[in-house]
Each structure stands twice: as C-alpha cells, then as structure tokens.
UniProtKB/Swiss-Prot annotation:
Its main location: virion. Belongs to the rotavirus VP7 family. GO terms for cellular component: host cell endoplasmic reticulum lumen; T=13 icosahedral viral capsid; viral outer capsid. Ca(2+) 2 binds at Q177, D228, V229, D231, D301. Coiled coil: none annotated. This is Outer capsid glycoprotein VP7. Residues 165-167 are annotated as: CNP motif. The lineage of its organism: Viruses, Riboviria, Orthornavirae, Duplornaviricota, Resentoviricetes.
C-alpha cells in the first residue's frame, strides 16, 4: 500500500519537474523568436525611413531646384503639378503626342518628366460637380463663355477657397446663415433650391411654409450653386434631393495651391461672393489667345512665376472631402 503511494508521489514530482523543464524551454524559444522579430523589424524600419529622407523637404525659392535622396541615386522633385483643361483643347490640337511635347517643354523650366499631370474635363459645369485637385500645385484652365460666366465664378469661388462643411437635414430642421463666410453649397446633376424665410413665430415671410410653390427660388437646374441668404433668419429649404445634395459651409480662407487661368474674355472674372470682400485676382489670371497651343506655350513660359504666387499645400480636394473638411 505504501509502495503505491510512494510511486504516485514520485510520478507526480517527476511530472512537475518535466513540465517545468518544458515551460522553460518554450520560454527560451519564444524569447529567441520575439527578439529576432524585433531586431528584423527595427532594421527594416531604419532602412525604410532612410529611403524616405528628403521627400518632405520644403520648397524655398524657385521650382527649378531639385533634391537628391540621400540613400538613392535618382534625382527627383518634391512637387507635382496638375493642369486641368477642357476637352476642346485636345480636340483643337489634334495631336496624339501633344502631352509628351509639353512635358519636354516643362522639363526646360525645371519640372522633370512625370511631375506634370494633364487632366481633361468635358465642361465647366461637369467639372464643378466633381472637382479633384490632388497635386501639390493645381492650374485650372477655364475657357471664357459669357453664358457660363456665373458658373465659372462659382466654380472659382469653390476651388480657390477652403470650406468647412456639414450635411443639412432640410426635412427636419430650419437653417440660418451666421455671417458672410457662411454659405449653403449644393451639388448634383440638377439642383433647384427654394427657400422660405421665417419670422420669430416660424411663419413664412412672403411665403407659405406648406406651399413650396410660394418659396423663393435661388437656384434652378444647376450643377453647382453657392446659396447666400439674409444672415440671422431661419429658412425652410426645398431641394431636389434625388439629384442634388446641399451642405452648410463656412469659408475658411484661400486654397493657395490652386490657380485659375481664364482663357479669353475682356476682364478677369471677379469671384467675390459678397461686396465686403476684396476681389481675389492674384491666383485668378487671364490669357487671351485663340489657339490652345498658344495658351499652353504661355503657361509653360510663365509656370514658375505662376507658382510663386501659390503655396504648396498637402490638403486635396474632391467632391466627397469637400463636404466635410477641405
């Protein structure tokens, strides 16, 4: 009987010793794996960081300056330039290699091949619905058209400024504008915006809140509309929600990495949204040529002077980001 008990105790002790040995072995193996993994991770991180030195160098002075990466032999420029032009330009030029030709010309001004991107848009109206300004510097060419003068002004006001925007639920709430920097911006394939100003008893001023036909129309069948109403007064808003969206926006200030080149027209458009703001013409320029080749030649010739009145910014613009924070 005692022999069986001693045997059981002995087996139990041996099991504990064996388990302790196994645990120590596993611990040593895990420590080795973890330390090796950390060593490899640190080494890769150091190499990766070294390859990126110089990518975020600030630009000081002329765009002719190029920077060399300290761990790579390639010469590169830290900035990109996007040139937005209407379909009319490529149609008139009618040359399959015209972009390559212009790239070679930009090269003589200090812009390496691959740093200049050409973006085509069908019309000012369509471009205003989905502006995409992703480069460090963005030049938008707009052919002057008297019938589209207001559309051009609104588009320029949109892309030359930064906006902080929030969605509006016009089915549940009334809205008012707090100041001249506060605007309602609607976008879509067809935007018709009507408003009914309200008094302190929420009764319509010159309109009936239950009758949309009595509302005041401030935009009709537009793709982009920047709506300005009397500040400090609640408004009930009616909108074609199936084809349009509307956002409550505040103008924060100039978007300094964008410039607009107006092609033609007697004067540069004044994009000022209200009479108390000084006209913004520094980044709104005009060239007056009939042929698009001449327009592009002029831009290449003066590209570095144009960039000097701009500032490189990291914030991009598209129709989705614009709604919330640009």
């Amino acid at each position: 009987m005692y022999g069986i008990e001693y045997t059981t105790i002995l087996i139990f002790l041996i099991s504990i010793i064996l388990l302790n040995y196994i645990l120590k072995s596993v611990t040593r193996i895990m420590d080795y794996i973890i330390y090796r993994f950390l060593l490899i991770t640190v080494a890769l991180f150091a190499l990766t960081r070294a390859q990126n030195y110089g990518l975020n160098l600030p630009i000081t002075g002329s765009m002719d300056t190029v920077y060399t990466n300290s761990t790579q032999e390639e010469v590169f420029l830290t900035s990109t330039l996007c040139l937005y032009y209407p379909t009319e330009a490529s149609t008139q030029i009618n040359d399959g290699d015209w972009k390559d030709s212009l790239s070679q010309m930009f090269l003589t001004k200090g812009w390496p091949t691959g740093s200049v991107y050409f973006k085509e848009y069908s019309s000012i109206v369509d471009f205003s619905v989905d502006p995409q300004l992703y480069c460090d510097y963005n030049l938008v060419l707009m052919k002057y058209d008297q019938s589209l003068e207001l559309d051009m002004s609104e588009l320029a006001d949109l892309i030359l400024n930064e906006w902080l925007c929030n969605p509006m639920d016009i089915t549940l709430y009334y809205y008012q504008q707090s100041g001249e920097s506060n605007k309602w911006i609607s976008m879509g394939s067809s935007c018709t915006v009507k408003v009914c100003p309200l008094n302190t008893q929420t009764l319509g001023i010159g309109c009936q809140t239950t009758n949309v036909d009595s509302f005041e129309m401030v935009a009709e069948n537009e793709k982009l509309a920047i709506v300005d109403v009397v500040d400090g007064i609640n408004h009930k808003i009616n909108l074609t929600t199936t084809t349009c969206t509307i956002r409550n926006c505040k103008k924060l200030g100039p978007r300094e990495n964008v410039a607009v080149i107006q092609v033609g027209g007697s004067n540069v458009l004044d994009i000022t949204a209200d009479p108390t703001t000084n006209p913004q013409t520094e980044r709104m320029m005009r060239v007056n040529w009939k042929k698009w080749w001449q327009v592009f030649y002029t831009i290449v010739d003066y590209i570095n002077q144009i960039v000097q009145v701009m500032s490189k910014r990291s914030r991009s613009l598209n129709s989705a980001a614009f709604y919330y924070r640009v």
